[in-house]
Each structure stands twice: as structure tokens, then as C-alpha cells.
């Protein structure tokens, strides 16, 4: 089977630094080479027209998510319904996962286990400076703005 190691990747930087553009550029270039499906989670539908039409946008704000457990359950629900899923993008990760003033390490660690188990990549934009992030997630940073 597919021996490619799935992973969790972070695009980090303070608000307004251009993380969403990096995320959109990444998803739109990856979609050309990926056979399976891609889902993009965001806090609104604002970026709908900037996404390739093969990417499914889900506006998480519509689903009454109140904490990180509900968010992870929501993500598992999406995975359970799509056996071709290869990548999930989480824009405004802190907001959509209800982690705005919280430590993200436990959630990132669980996403890592899910990534391995379900063979899905997770690419997250995180509105924090690299210096504000726990050591345990620093090796997952692919872009620091």
C-alpha cells in the first residue's frame, strides 16, 4: 500500500501576517497532484472563490462547536464519510477548534494519531508567533511568518 507518511503541518504567525494566503496557495497547488479528496475547514465562506472547485469548503461556524473535543469529533465525522480523503486544511485553527486561549499541544498530538491511523494530512494555520508555541509542536512548523 501507500507508504507515504501522513503528517500534521503548521503555518504559524501573528494575525494579519498572511497565513491564509500560504494555506490557499498550498491547497491549490496540492490539488493538482492529489488523486483523493481535500477538505478545507474555515470560520466562514469568505475564501470560497479562491479555492479550486475540487476542494470542499466547510464553514465550521455553522456547526455549534464549543470545545476542542467537539472539533475533533467533527473532524472524525468528516473522515468517516469520505474514504478518499487525503488532506484536510484548517484555516484559523485556534478559532475553529475553540482553542483561542488554550494550549494546543494535546489537540495537535491527537491530530497526529488520527493522521497516522486514517492516512490523512492535516495542514493548520495557527495565529500565534512561533515563540509562543509549545516545544512539542515546533517540528511540525512548515512556514513561520
What are these regions (language model features)?
Residues 1-4:
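Short, small-residue-biased leader/transition segments that mark boundaries at the very start
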Residues 8-78, 133-136:
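Conserved P-loop
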Residues 19, 67, 71-74, 85, ...:
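Amphipathic alpha-helical interface surfaces
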Residues 9-11, 38, 85-90, 122:
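Generic beta-sheet signal
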Amino acid at each position: 500500500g501507500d507508504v507515504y507518511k501522513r503528517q500534521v503541518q503548521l503555518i504559524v504567525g501573528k494575525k494579519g501576517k498572511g497565513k491564509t494566503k500560504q494555506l490557499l496557495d498550498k491547497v491549490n497547488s496540492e490539488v493538482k497532484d492529489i488523486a483523493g479528496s481535500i477538505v478545507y475547514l474555515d470560520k466562514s465562506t469568505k475564501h470560497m472563490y479562491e479555492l479550486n472547485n475540487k476542494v470542499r469548503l466547510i464553514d465550521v461556524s455553522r456547526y455549534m462547536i464549543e470545545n476542542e473535543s467537539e472539533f475533533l469529533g467533527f473532524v472524525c465525522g468528516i473522515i468517516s464519510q469520505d474514504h478518499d480523503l487525503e488532506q484536510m486544511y484548517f484555516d484559523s485553527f485556534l478559532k475553529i477548534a475553540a482553542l483561542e486561549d488554550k494550549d494546543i499541544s494535546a489537540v495537535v498530538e491527537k491530530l497526529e494519531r488520527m493522521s497516522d491511523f486514517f492516512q490523512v494530512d492535516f495542514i493548520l494555520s495557527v495565529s500565534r508567533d512561533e515563540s509562543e508555541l509549545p516545544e512539542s509542536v515546533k517540528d511540525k512548523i512548515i512556514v513561520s511568518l
